[in-house]
């Protein structure tokens, strides 16, 4: 029982937690822009599932993690555009449409997995990039500063997104449209 609470296990769990939460951070940043523009997208999880499957499949078949990442971004963007079109242009209820997009992403990703793969495969992920000096800090260095590049980019995007939304003309326009769609 004591080995469960050892420093190595706790550090490993916390480090993995940060790495595994990164896709949700990306989704939250993207959804923040959507929310501020007045679109409630409850289908974000479906976007993530379809993007994750597309990314995995492309990375598996091409051997390129970069191609997989690019296709995930493309699939997520297309799903977001489709959601925006349905709610803004077709005047569909955002909550119901979002749930529909979530269920579509859930079902389609599972269907494509079974049709195209059928069995569990693995793809080696992006390599860990330790940040010099900071990664040597006991405990905190191992948790925060020995991650892959996508984790670092996600955390850098948080203040960038805040700046864009709150300190730029583009952010003002996004917030204005979200507050008053008739403007």
Mark where each language-model region is.
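A generic, well-ordered mixed alpha/beta core segment in the N-terminal half of proteins
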Residues: 74-132
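Membrane-helix/interface signature in polytopic inner-membrane proteins
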Residues: 160-183
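Short, strongly hydrophobic alpha-helical membrane anchors
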Residues: 1-12, 136
């Amino acid at each position: 029982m004591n080995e469960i609470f050892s420093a190595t296990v706790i550090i490993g769990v916390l480090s993995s937690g940060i790495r595994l939460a990164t896709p949700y951070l990306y989704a939250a940043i993207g959804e923040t822009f959507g929310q501020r523009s007045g679109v409630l997208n409850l289908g974000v999880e479906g976007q993530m599932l379809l993007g994750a499957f597309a990314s995995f499949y492309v990375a598996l078949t091409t051997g390129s993690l970069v191609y997989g990442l690019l296709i995930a971004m493309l699939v997520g963007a297309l799903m977001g555009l489709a959601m925006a079109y349905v709610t803004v242009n077709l005047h569909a209820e955002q909550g119901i449409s979002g749930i529909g997009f979530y269920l579509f992403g859930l079902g389609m990703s599972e269907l494509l997995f079974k049709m195209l793969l059928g069995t569990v495969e693995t793809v080696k992920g992006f390599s860990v990039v330790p940040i010099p000096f900071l990664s040597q800090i006991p405990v905190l260095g191992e948790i925060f500063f020995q991650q892959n590049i996508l984790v670092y980019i996600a955390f850098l995007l948080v203040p960038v997104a805040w700046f864009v939304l709150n300190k730029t003309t583009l952010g003002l326009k996004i917030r204005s449209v979200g507050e008053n769609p008739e403007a």
